[in-house]
Amino acid sequence: MNEEKTFSDILFKSTLAVRLINLVKPIVSSHLEQCLADKSLNYDELGDEHEKMLKKAIAIYANLGTVVSDLEKVVVFLRLDKEKVSQIYPDLSLEEYYNYHLENYVIRINSLPDILAQLGNTICNWGIPKKKCYGTTIPDSTKVTDEDIKNK
């Protein structure tokens, strides 16, 4: 039996995900252990700049995974038969139901370039301030070089 892979499956089994997880696992383990032993420590402040970057990158990647998973859930909701929707959600009109999930889908889709920009900014050390780092600002940034974005 050939099971269909979801985008989440592909995302979390990608080379980037595997490398990030393998790099960050011992760091996170050590920092959590230190924080448990000494409650005065701040997890986010532990580690050298490289370790902090890896912890930030894995958090952004996890956020990307959450958004992708949410998109997959929206598709499930949008596939529901009209009669089934009416049975499950009798207080909602079909228009309200579908508008809600379609808006949710659009919001999630629109957040993907921003999350990817944050991930690139973190991994490539572009130095773009977080408040100015969006998918739409990357093409205009002088800090992003052709070497950072390669066609493969």
Please state what every model-predicted region is.
Residues 92-152:
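Short non-catalytic regulatory patches outside canonical folded cores
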